[in-house]
């Protein structure tokens, strides 16, 4: 049977496609331009501030640069007397695109649906700011939550680090960094949604499912070169930090309970399957979902379809239990 999209996904995708497909990107900045145009089209809009309030904080990163950390919380959560679990969200975008502002609607939706405070880090983007900026900005934001837990009314023992796509890879790198730097208290939960983990990922050009990939090998190579450098990206013998490419980590011992999901038509499918296998090998508790017939960022390209609903239910269930 030929590889094909899930029928419901294919029908929904056809509704948002128009005209000729864009030419393959030639630079990381082209990816940023195209991604931001797509994000503005498919990401939900943030609700009014009386439904989900937004508060901005300033975090000092490893090099002294000030980073924006934005909280999304409902009035009910802000009135809570007991310290609340918190979600630190790291957006996707191939290391080269995405901002807290553009992703605000998705962050607000999580805060509204699960009734938890969501903190989104506006990490610096490659190629202007290559590794280690993104992961260090995210780690600094995690430290900020712990150091300011009392004034933020959050429980530092119940923090989930969540990311999707490149943000998922940065989330894994952040949690590895927290483990190795002996952050106390440790991260309670890791949620990596179709994470981008391995700069060495490579498929033969005739791999059948690649014709249905929404994030292609061309995108991937440009993104990794922007993030870790052209002289290192994709080269097995190059020295690439596991905080940048977590698939290169020697082990995952001591990582928190982890949620991972990915579609069968996602370029990251195989590296994510290997990540899950190694987590289990290192005795890390894992919940894993493999969604059939859908590619990268399927939930934004076809919102409301069954696999989007199933994925959202699974993710929200995990976040409510942090």
Explain the meaning of each model-derived region:
Residues 156-158, 172-322:
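Alpha/beta hydrolase fold serine-hydrolase catalytic domain that processes acyl esters and thioesters
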Residues 69-83, 247-252:
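Short beta-strand-to-loop junctions in surface cap/lid or active-site-entrance loops
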Residues 146-161:
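Gly/Ser-rich "nucleophile elbow"/oxyanion-hole loop immediately N-terminal to the catalytic nucleophile
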Residues 163, 167, 171:
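Gly/Ala-rich beta-loop-alpha elbow adjacent to hydrolase catalytic centers
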Residues 101-120:
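Short amphipathic alpha-helix adjacent to the substrate-entry channel of hydrolases
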Residues 72, 90-93, 262-263:
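The conserved beta1-alpha1 loop
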Residues 82-92:
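Short beta-strand element of the alpha/beta-hydrolase
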Residues 1-74, 233-236, 321:
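A glycine/proline-hinged amphipathic helix-loop "lid/cap" segment
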């Amino acid at each position: 049977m030929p590889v094909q999209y899930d029928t419901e996904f294919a029908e929904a995708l056809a509704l948002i496609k128009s005209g000729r497909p864009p030419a393959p990107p030639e630079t990381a900045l082209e990816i940023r331009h195209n991604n931001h145009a797509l994000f503005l089209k498919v990401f939900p809009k943030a609700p009014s501030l009386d439904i989900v309030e937004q508060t901005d904080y300033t975090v000092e990163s490893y090099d002294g640069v000030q980073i924006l950390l934005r909280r999304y919380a409902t009035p009910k959560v802000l009135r809570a007397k007991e310290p609340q679990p918190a979600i630190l969200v790291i957006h996707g975008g191939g290391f080269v695109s995405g901002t807290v502002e553009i992703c605000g609607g998705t962050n607000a939706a999580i805060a509204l649906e699960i009734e938890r405070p969501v903190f989104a880090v506006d990490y610096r983007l490659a190629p202007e700011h290559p590794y280690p900026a993104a992961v260090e900005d995210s780690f600094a934001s995690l430290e900020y939550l712990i150091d300011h837990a009392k004034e933020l009314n959050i429980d530092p023992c119940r923090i989930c680090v969540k990311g999707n796509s490149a943000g998922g890879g940065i989330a894994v790198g952040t949690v590895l960094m927290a483990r190795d730097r002996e952050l106390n208290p440790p991260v309670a939960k890791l949620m990596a949604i179709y994470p981008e983990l391995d700069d060495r990922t490579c498929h033969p050009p005739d791999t059948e499912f690649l014709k249905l990939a929404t994030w292609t090998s061309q995108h991937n190579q440009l993104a990794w070169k922007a993030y870790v450098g052209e002289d290192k990206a994709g080269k097995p013998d190059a020295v690439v930090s596991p905080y940048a490419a977590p698939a290169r980590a020697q082990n995952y011992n001591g990582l928190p309970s982890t949620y991972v999901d990915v579609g069968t038509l996602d370029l990251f499918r195989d590296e994510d399957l290997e990540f899950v296998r190694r987590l289990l090998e290192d005795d890390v508790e894992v919940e894993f979902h493999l969604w059939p017939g859908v590619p990268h960022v399927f939930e934004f390209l076809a919102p409301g379809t069954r696999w989007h609903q199933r994925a959202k239910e699974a993710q929200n269930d995990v976040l409510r239990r942090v």
